[in-house]
């Protein structure tokens, strides 16, 4: 998890999250600017409405005042016309009664005018309060509508993101299941190979074989050692190889081959010496038959010489027979060792191939495991980021609801 690939992925995720946060903050700033502009427009419209209402109220007041002044001026004009001498003389009683009624009416309009003005003031106050409350309700309604639209957009965006994250989660889950299935298959293969190696070791132990490491192939001392290069031989062959000295298997076999050549050369030399001695003995026999008339002293010397020659010949024959036996045993051992070396080299090559395949499978499994862990970490970071964003949006929503 501390790989450079995982670090690059985490930085990419952080950059993507920071870009999303910047985009969201930019959208929020634009929404706040639009809301402020709408509020300013509503305030301006409210001021214009209030000025218009005041103007209408002034016009209404002027109209009512004018109407009341006209109503107040009419009884006085009537009284003036009735007070003209000689106009309606026959109806003096009725005119007197009318004068008293006009006096009462002249007092009643003042009271009715004050009552009307008070009622008008109350109506105006109620009207103003109703207009203000209506404007406030209109503003609150527009704010709530805007908030509802914003929340709807946010909810739709969140639903789309959640659907996308659900799809990604399903894909990642399927990929994880596939990886687990592949891991189980590879684990089964690994168990089978381990069982095969165990059977091989049991076979080697059962037949009394010995594993000889072959660290430097082809007898190259300066060559780097090959990991896992081994050779399996019998115990007798192992003793023979130990007698050849230390070193790689090729070097030991080369030493045995050189010793074999030396022994063959010694045997040839001994055969030549034996032929020479046989020729000498034949010559001595011929000389002994020719010199039968020699003296007894010379005969004794010849007999001694012949005995020595026969003894040497017998010794050489024994050495030659022993060397031939050693040569045959060495040849048999070399042939057997060569066959075993061929077999064990093939077995070692197969084991190396199996081991290389196992190492490759192990490396591939480790890479897949690291990839799966990186993906899981990325998904956890994405999930945590989404949870934080969802909590933030819930907090904003509760704050908006509390402000309402």
From Swiss-Prot:
What are this entry's molecular-function GO terms? LRR domain binding
InterPro entries xrefs = LRRFIP1/2
Q: Name one Pfam family in it.
A: LRRFIP
Note whether Nucleotide-binding occurs among the keywords.
Answer: no
Residues folding into a coiled coil are: 27-71, 110-199, 249-397
Please provide the record's keywords in A-Z order.
Coiled coil, Developmental protein, Wnt signaling pathway
Q: Where is the composition biased (Polar residues)?
A: 69-84, 282-296
Q: Does the keyword Coiled coil apply?
A: yes
Ranges of Basic and acidic residues compositional bias? 56-68
Question: What are the recorded Gene Ontology BP terms?
Answer: dorsal/ventral axis specification; regulation of DNA-templated transcription; Wnt signaling pathway
Q: Where is this region: Disordered?
A: 56-112, 277-296
PANTHER family of this UniProt entry?
LEUCINE RICH REPEAT IN FLII INTERACTING PROTEIN, LEUCINE-RICH REPEAT FLIGHTLESS-INTERACTING PROTEIN 2
Spell out the family assignment given in the record's similarity comment: Belongs to the LRRFIP family.
Its biological purpose is as follows: May function as an activator of the canonical Wnt signaling pathway upstream of ctnnb1/beta-catenin. May be required for dorsal axis formation.
Q: What is this protein called?
A: Leucine-rich repeat flightless-interacting protein 2
- Gene behind this protein: lrrfip2
């Amino acid at each position: 998890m501390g790989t450079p690939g995982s670090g690059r992925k985490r930085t990419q995720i952080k950059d993507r999250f920071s870009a999303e946060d910047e985009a969201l903050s930019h959208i929020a700033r634009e929404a706040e600017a639009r809301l402020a502009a709408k509020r300013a427009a509503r305030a301006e419209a409210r001021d214009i409405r209030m000025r218009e209402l005041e103007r209408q109220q002034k016009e209404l007041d002027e109209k009512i005042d004018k109407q009341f002044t006209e109503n107040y001026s009419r009884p006085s004009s009537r009284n003036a016309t009735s007070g003209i001498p000689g106009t309606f003389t026959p109806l003096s009683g009725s005119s007197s009664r009318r004068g008293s009624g006009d006096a009462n009416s002249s007092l009643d309009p003042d009271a009715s005018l004050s009552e009307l003005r008070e009622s008008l003031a109350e109506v105006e106050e109620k009207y103003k309060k109703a207009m203000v409350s209506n404007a406030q309700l209109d503003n609150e309604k527009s704010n709530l509508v805007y908030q509802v639209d914003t929340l709807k957009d946010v909810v739709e965006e969140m639903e789309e993101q959640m659907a996308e994250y659900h799809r990604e989660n399903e894909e990642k889950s399927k990929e994880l299941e596939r990886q687990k299935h592949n891991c189980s298959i590879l684990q089964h293969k690994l168990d089978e190979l381990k069982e095969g190696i165990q059977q091989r070791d049991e076979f080697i132990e059962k037949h009394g074989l010995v594993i000889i490491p072959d660290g430097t192939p082809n007898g190259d001392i300066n060559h780097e050692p090959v990991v896992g290069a081994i050779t399996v031989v019998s115990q007798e062959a192992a003793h023979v190889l130990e007698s050849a000295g230390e070193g790689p298997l090729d070097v030991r076999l080369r030493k045995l081959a050189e010793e074999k050549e030396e022994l063959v050369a010694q045997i040839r030399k001994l055969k030549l010496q034996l032929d020479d001695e046989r020729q000498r003995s034949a010559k001595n026999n011929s000389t002994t038959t020719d010199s039968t008339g020699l003296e007894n002293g010379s005969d004794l010397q010849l007999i001694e010489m012949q005995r020595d020659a026969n003894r040497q010949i017998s010794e050489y024959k024994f050495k030659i027979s022993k060397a031939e036996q050693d040569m045959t045993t060495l040849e048999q051992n070399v042939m057997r060792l060569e066959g075993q070396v061929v077999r064990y080299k093939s077995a070692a090559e197969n084991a190396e191939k199996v081991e290389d395949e196992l190492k490759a499978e192990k490396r591939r499994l480790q890479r897949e495991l690291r990839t799966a862990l990186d993906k899981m970490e990325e998904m956890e970071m994405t999930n945590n980021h989404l949870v934080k964003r969802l909590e933030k949006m819930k907090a904003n929503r509760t704050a908006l609801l509390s402000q309402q």
